[in-house]
Amino acid sequence: PGTVRALALAHERYGKLPWATLFEPAITLAEQGFVISPRLATLLAKDPYLAGDPDARAYFYQADGTPKTAGTRLTNPALARVLRTLASDGPDAFYRGPLAEAMVAKVHAHPTNPGVLSAADLASYQAKLRDGLCFDYRQSEICGFPTPSSGTIALGQIFGMLESRDMAALKPVQGEQGQLAASSEAIHLYSEAARLAFADRNQYVADVVDVPVTGLLDKGYLAQRGHLIGNRSMGVAQP
C-alpha cells in the first residue's frame, strides 16, 4: 500500500510529466487487456490458492472452475477505474474514502487469514526519504535501499565474501544449445556466499530491530565468512 505514496513523492520531487499522464499506459492496458501466455496458463493450472478467492477466481478462471487458457485475453476494467480515480483525484484517493474502505474490508474478510489493517493505518501512511546504503566492491561503490530493506545488506555480504576470488576467470561457458551459461564453479561460489548471507539475514535483519549493518558489512568479518566456502556445499549455513 505504500507504493502510491512513494510514487507521488518521487513525482513531486523529480517528475516532469503531469501526474495524470503517467497513468495513461496502465489504464489502456487494463482496459484493452493482455493475452494469457503459455507460462501464465501453466501457473494457473498449478496454483492451489487463487481459485479460493472470489475476485481472483472470476478473473483467472472459467465459470466451471477451470483456468483460462493460453491465448485468452484478460481485461481489468475495475483496475482501470481505480487508476482513473488516482489520476484525477491524486494519491490521497488511495488512502482515504471508498478505495481505502474497500481494501480494509477485503483484508478483514479473508476467509482463512484475516488481517488487522485499519482505515487509520492507510490514512496516516507517509512515504519516507532515506539515505541509501552503500558498500565498496573493488573499484566500485554499490548503493541500494537501507534498512528495513534487507537486499542491499545481503548483496554487500555476497560481494564481500567473493571479493578475494578471481570471479573474472570464471567466465560463462557455451551450453549445448549454443547459449552462454554460468560455469558450475561460479554458481557454486555464488550459491555458498548467498547461503551464508541469508543465514545472517534471517538472524540479524528484521523490521523493528537494531540491525548491526556496520558489522554485517565489515570487510574483515566477510573475509572470515568467505573462508567457510569450500569445494563442496556446506549444507545448512549457520549465522
Give a label for each model feature.
Residues 1-96, 100-150, 167, 227-232:
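Noncatalytic scaffold domains of N-terminal-nucleophile
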Residues 38, 116-119, 152, 211, ...:
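Low-complexity, intrinsically disordered regions enriched in charged/polar residues
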Residues 146, 154-156, 209:
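Short conserved micro-motifs at the rims of enzyme active sites and ligand-binding pockets
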Residues 1-14, 151-188:
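Gly/Pro-rich active-site capping loops and adjacent beta-alpha segments
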Residues 26, 83, 158, 193-197:
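Short alpha-helical scaffolding segments that buttress acidic/His motifs in well-ordered protein cores
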Residues 167-239:
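Internal maturation/activation junctions in enzymes
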